[in-house]
């Protein structure tokens, strides 16, 4: 690629070596050449991107350049852009188009970003491999038989394959950082509340965060400068001043205190990833940082806590998709016919039970007939059964169970208490160190289909990322090389920091990538 990062493209634009239209055309050619194999995009807005690029070029000629003019950006398909599809990778919303722009889209468009298309993702952002999408799996651009990670796998794959300068993703339990690590890009999860969630289709509202995936720390900082800040449309956005994240990127790590959480380097971590992360830590030590071990004792409960909190919130958020107000609607006549057939079956079984003198079974069948669904309830059930995939159904059922009478205190309330303990672990650690260095994932990318039959093993892939979401902390992953046992497939290193200190993470990330 001639201009792989936006920083490169901006220099070329300023020097008159290229134009916004030429940049968009170059990426469209690459999408046409590569995306049939990768499946990173669910839709591409060729005409819209080219028209906007021409407009930005005309503005530059008039002496009115925008700060992000020339940034060709892909957007995860759970973030709303007015008039664009917003499917969330689900049959439930396969034909739905957004009626408004997310706040991040408003801010990026005003700054001159060019939206080239929507990227594929795990259904409703629920997954760690991008295999649950209604539009088919995304493939890792470095090795198509491997997963790109999830749920923002399409965004990570698009950036890694050079199909755009950068992409937006959402991170609920690692969904920006894990695919960024698997695809070899930078992935930033800002502090909860740093970036508005308005226009992000909700998965778990207390965990969801929008963040950029890029090819450099500088590009991530440039995008965060625009999308960060309080928003009156999102009551959870924080009234905290936004610094210039590009300042200090080259300051290095001298004098910083970096912590290595012992729980993140324990059993279960791939040996080569351990070695590669340790080598980077040694480099940081040589560059003037002070490195020490720290403990986050409640880390072992992170995955269980996350999957209770996230699924409980998901079961509530996804209740809105009923096929009536919006979402996939089952065929009404087929629903009525199926309902009538079921009633006839129950009547036949009831008659048989009475004929055999089985009063207990007859009473049960009679109660079922009395409680049989109305046509409207049956339509809800059929629409949701057809519209949601298996993983989404699994999480809705788990969340509904955790919130049900008799189990709320036992599971959900206890998970919230453990969540508080996890946050306190980080607060104590940051009294002694400035930032934490960890692996992003316990393993390198795995093959497509390798873990689809074992949800627990898939969930455990999030073990190093979910705690940052539970605590609301910022997290950054940067690529640190290729895994020796899976040649060509990247490994990521994660940096975690105190609330609202994204600038520190980007500074450390830039030092690692030098």
Swiss-Prot record:
Q: Name one GO molecular function term.
A: ATP binding
GO annotation, cellular component aspect = glutamyl-tRNA(Gln) amidotransferase complex
Q: Name one GO biological process term.
A: translation
**The organism's place on the tree of life at top rank:** Bacteria
Q: Which residues form the active site?
A: 76, 151, 175
What does the similarity note say?
A: Belongs to the amidase family. GatA subfamily.
Protein name, as recorded:
Glutamyl-tRNA(Gln) amidotransferase subunit A
The organism encoding this protein is Salinibacter ruber (strain DSM 13855 / M31)
């Amino acid at each position: 690629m001639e201009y792989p990062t936006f920083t490169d493209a901006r220099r070329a634009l300023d020097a008159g070596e290229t134009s916004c239209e030429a940049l968009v055309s170059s990426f469209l050619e690459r999408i046409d050449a590569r995306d049939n194999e990768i499946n990173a995009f669910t839709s591409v807005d060729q005409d819209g991107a080219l028209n906007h690029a021409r407009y930005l070029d005309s503005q530059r000629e008039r002496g009115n350049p925008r700060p992000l003019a020339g940034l060709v950006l892909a957007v995860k398909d759970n973030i709303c852009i007015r008039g664009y599809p917003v499917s969330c990778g689900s049959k439930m919303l396969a034909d739905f188009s957004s009626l408004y722009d997310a706040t991040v889209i408003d801010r990026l468009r005003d700054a001159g970003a060019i939206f080239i298309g929507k990227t594929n993702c795990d259904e409703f952002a629920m997954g760690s491999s991008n295999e649950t999408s209604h539009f088919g799996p995304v493939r890792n651009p470095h090795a198509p038989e491997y997963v790109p990670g999830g749920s923002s796998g399409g965004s990570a794959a698009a950036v890694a394959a050079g199909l755009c300068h950068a992409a937006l993703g959402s991170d609920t339990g690692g969904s920006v950082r894990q695919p960024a690590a698997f695809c070899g890009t930078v992935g930033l999860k800002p502090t909860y509340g740093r970036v508005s969630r308005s226009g992000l289709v909700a998965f778990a509202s207390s965990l969801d965060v929008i963040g950029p995936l890029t090819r450099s720390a500088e590009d991530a900082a440039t995008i965060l400068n625009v999308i960060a800040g309080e928003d009156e449309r999102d009551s959870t956005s924080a009234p905290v001043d936004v610094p210039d994240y590009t300042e200090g990127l080259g300051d290095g790590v001298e004098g910083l205190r970096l912590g290595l959480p012992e729980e993140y380097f324990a059993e279960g971590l791939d040996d080569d990833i351990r070695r590669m992360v340790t080598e980077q830590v040694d480099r940081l030590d040589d560059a003037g940082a002070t490195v020490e071990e720290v403990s986050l004792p409640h880390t072992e409960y992170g995955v269980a806590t996350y999957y209770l909190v996230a699924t409980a919130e998901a079961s509530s958020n996804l209740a809105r998709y009923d096929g009536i107000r919006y979402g996939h609607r089952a065929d009404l006549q087929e629903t009525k016919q199926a309902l009538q057939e079921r009633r006839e079956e129950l009547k036949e079984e009831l008659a048989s039970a009475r004929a055999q003198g089985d009063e207990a079974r007859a009473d049960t069948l009679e109660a079922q007939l009395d409680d049989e669904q109305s046509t409207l309830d049956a339509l809800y059930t059929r629409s949701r059964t057809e519209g949601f995939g298996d993983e989404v159904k699994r999480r809705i059922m788990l969340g509904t169970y955790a919130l049900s009478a008799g189990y709320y205190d036992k599971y959900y309330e206890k998970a919230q208490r453990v969540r508080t303990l996890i946050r306190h672990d980080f607060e104590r650690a940051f009294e002694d160190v400035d930032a934490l260095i960890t692996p992003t994932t316990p393993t390198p990318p795995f093959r497509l289909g390798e873990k689809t039959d074992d949800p627990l093993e898939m969930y455990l892939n999030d073990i190093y990322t979910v705690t940052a979401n539970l605590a609301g902390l910022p997290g950054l992953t940067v690529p640190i090389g290729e895994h020796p046992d899976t040649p060509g497939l990247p490994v990521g290193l994660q940096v975690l920091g105190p609330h609202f200190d994204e600038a520190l993470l980007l500074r450390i990330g830039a030092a690692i990538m030098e």
